[in-house]
Structures are given as structure tokens and as C-alpha cells.
Amino acid sequence: MAEPKTKYDRQLRIWGELGQSALETASICLLNCGPTGSEALKNLVIGGIGSITIVDGSKVEIGDLGNNFMVDAKSVGQSRAKTVCGFLQELNDSVKANFVEENPDTLISTDPSFFSQFTLVIATQLVEDSMVKLDRICREANVMLVLARSYGLTGFVRISVKEHTAIETKPDHSLDDLRLNSPWPELKSYVESIDLNVEEPAAHKHIPYVVILVKVAEEWAQHHSGNLPSTREEKNEFKDLVKSKMVSADEENYKEALLAAFKVFAPTGISQEIQDINHDSCAEVGSNSSDFWVMVAALKEFISNEGGGEVPLEGSMPDMISSTEHYINLQKIYHSKAEADFLSMEQRVKSILVKVGQDPSSISKPTIKSFCKNARKLKVCRYRTIEDEFKSPSTTELHKYLADENYSGAIGFYILLRAVDRFAGTYKKFPGQFDGSTDEDASQLKTIALSLLSEMGCDGYELQEELYNEMCRFGAAEIHVVAALIGGITSQEVIKLITKQFVPKRGTFIFNGIDHKSQSLTL
């Protein structure tokens, strides 16, 4: 068997050893192992999830051979849970795999305590009543839940957890934490020791842009009552001031300074989002507070004291044109400041842990260090219960989506994916499931959908007429290509939740295979 670092080399580059460790200790339960569930679990098994338990009471049918790669002709008539479990185990023998041959709807009703043993439950192809019951069970047991369903050419993914906190959110774009407009004493002292008017051309061409911009910002502030540029005109004047320091037109370090000038104009202090997290009621910690909120409480203290209104410094520097000496010196200054901030935070975390009666060493140094490095990018996600969303959706958002042509497909499928469950409850079949009933089923489905819209406070709205016929043509089929996409997105969100890295999707993700669109609805 390959060593973990070799086996998982590529993904370790994405979520690191801490993330991989979280995956390898996680326990996942999958309800229904049709193509959607099998595809979701396949991705997690290959990624090295700790253990899986499949719950499915059905037998493999001939129809399964056309849309599920985790069964074969030899398995027809055998337990689907056992068959899929066996094939998945072959993909990664380090994953513990179990199966339970029972109908998930029955298990939800008869043995709710079963789910408390898992880190996360993936529930696929459940009808509305079962989703509501399972969500209630998982919330009471503090187990994360991801709901997924593929239905013809549409499908959805919906996360349901009380609260999810993420430290390593890894945004696509973020501003380098260089503090060019609020340098601390050591950085200021080093910058002041460098002369921008040095006569030697080679030396002038290798002054890093951090030094150039801090010096020019200081000069600007001296002539503008201590203020930095704020208007477009002032920003252009600032850039002209940078240009005036150039000796020749080919000085790449000054060109870098001009391109990075916007970093001087960035607002100082902390973002509104981080302020909101600091003022969250959970930041008033107690003996049952999570590690995240203990560190937030420490961050709040840090900002008010040694941070001087700022979060801990990240400590990393981007590449830039510079002499080796200047770059290494700057690197040391940034690293030393980040380390000092970390040590201050560590002491505050320990002090708070003692105060609330927890073990002062219960939060590891790497965790605190990661928190400090990502303190500008923290995220707190809270999700409504499925029951709340179904019983009292946001009418403001609903009206907005129904009135917006761009969302007509997504909101239409959202309504109809609920309507087909009501249809099945009334007629004991899904619309279009049997040949020859499409027109009648479409009419009955429309009646149910309009009734549902009325219950949701949306009288007078109509869905696209063709969607009723499309839902009947789907016949509740799980098409493999759609199941693979929905399963892939499901596993992606599961990894985000377990590793606590990246930001999980908010609301209900809807895939519209007819228009080749995917959108999220927050209701």
C-alpha cells in the first residue's frame, strides 16, 4: 500500500495534512446508494475518508446497470448496499466500509439514534417528509447533513448544519497583508534606513516595492495632514509621486510599485464581516464553547490591545524585484511580527481556556497559528432547518426569484422537486413514471405546484409551462451524467465541511440541465 503522502500527494497540496487528517478520522453515512449516492461516496473513498456506512434496503435491478458503475451484471438480485460497498472498498482498501440492508425511510422513523455515531450524513433521493425528519435528528445529535437528489435533468444539493465555522477559507482573491499604510515600528525603522536616492543604478533598481510605497506613503501623509489618498485624483497624484522617484524608465521595481499602489489605499483595520464575528453572541465564551469561538474571543482581546485595531499579521510576502539582502531582511521583519502576534494570541487563548474551565493546552499550536494566519478571512455559516425553509420560506427572496427571468428555471425546479413528492404521496407514483400518463400527470402536477406556491405566499405566480412536461418526461429517473455532477458537488461540499476549509455553499444549489445552468437559492 502506498504511503499516505504519496497516495494523497495532489490533494495534500490543496488542504494540507490537517485537512487530510480530518478526512481520515471522519465517519460518513450514505442513505441510498443509487448513482447519485455512489458517485458522491466514490469521490470521498478515493480521497481517503475514514469510514463509510451505506444504508439501502433495495436489490440490484437490471435498470441499475445502465446508470451505476458500482454494480455489475453478476450482482443483479443481490443487496445493492453490499454490492456498492464491495466495489467502493476496492477503490481504497484503507477505508473502512460497512453496509446496512434497510430502507432509509424506515430507519429514520424507527431508529433515529443510529445516526449519532457519524460525523456527517449524506442523504440522497429522499422525499420531503424524510428530509425534514432526518434534519431534525441530525441537528439534535450535532451531526452534519448534506441532502442531494438527481431527478432527470435537474437536481439539488443542500447543506444543513446548525453552524459551520471555517478558518482556512482560501478565497480566490485576497489582498496581501503587507500593512503598507500602517507599518509597525520595526518595518518603519527598516524602511527609514534605506535611501531612495542612492546613486548606484543597480542598487536603485533593486529596492523592493514595499520600501518604495511605505516611504512614498509617509511623504504623502506629511503633506496631507497625515491622510493617505482617498479620491481618484489623489490616487493618481500618489502614483505620479512614485514615478518621480524613478531614475530611468526601465526600473521594474518601480513599475511593480505602481501596480501595487492600490495596496496603500486599502482600508486599515478589520472588515465588517470580522467585526460581526467578533460581536457575535457566541464570542462570549463559556465551558461548552468550541475552539473556534475561544480563539475569536482571544482575537477580540488582541485587536483591542497589542493589535492596535488590527488582526495578527499573516507574515507572508509575495515575490517582488529586490536584492537578496533586502528581501531576506523584509522577510525576517514580517516573520518576526507574525510570530510575536501568534505568541500573544496563544497566551490569550490559554488564559481564556483557564477562565472557562477548559484545559489550557486543548487547542494546539498549529491550530492557533492557522487561525492567526487566516484571521482576516474567517467565515461563520448558519443554515435554516429544512422544516423552517419548507414551512416559512423567505417570501421576499421567493418573489425576487419568481420575478427574475434569469432564475425562472432554478426556482421552477425547486418548486417542482417538492411538488413531485406531494404527487407521489397522493398518486403512489412519480409523475410520468409509467408510460401513457404524461399529459394527465402534467396537469395534476401543475395543480399541486400552484397549490404549493399559494401556501408559500406566492399567489398569482406561474412557473414556466414547459417545466411541468419536462418533469413528467424525467419520470423520476436518475440519469448517470446528472447523478455524477450532483454527486461530485455533494462530495466537494462534504470535504469543505469536514476539513473546515473553503466556504460551503449557502442555500439550495439547483442544477438545471435543460438550460445548462446552476444557481443557488437562499430561502
UniProtKB/Swiss-Prot annotation:
CDD domains: APPBP1_RUB (cd01493). The gene is AXL1. Pathway: Protein modification; protein neddylation. GO terms for molecular function: NEDD8 activating enzyme activity; nucleotide binding. This is NEDD8-activating enzyme E1 regulatory subunit AXL. Keywords: Nucleotide-binding, Nucleus, Ubl conjugation pathway. GO terms for biological process: post-embryonic development; protein neddylation. The keyword Nucleotide-binding applies. Signal peptide: none annotated. Heterodimer of ECR1 and AXL1. The complex binds to RUB1/NEDD8 and RCE1. It is found in: Nucleus. The keyword Nucleotide-binding applies. It comes from Arabidopsis thaliana. Regulatory subunit of the dimeric ECR1-AXL1 E1 enzyme. E1 activates RUB1/NEDD8 by first adenylating its C-terminal glycine residue with ATP, thereafter linking this residue to the side chain of the catalytic cysteine, yielding a RUB1-ECR1 thioester and free AMP. E1 finally transfers RUB1 to the catalytic cysteine of RCE1. May function redundantly with AXR1 in the RUB conjugating pathway. Seems not to be functionally equivalent to AXR1 in vivo. Belongs to the ubiquitin-activating E1 family. ULA1 subfamily. GO terms for cellular component: nucleus; peroxisome.
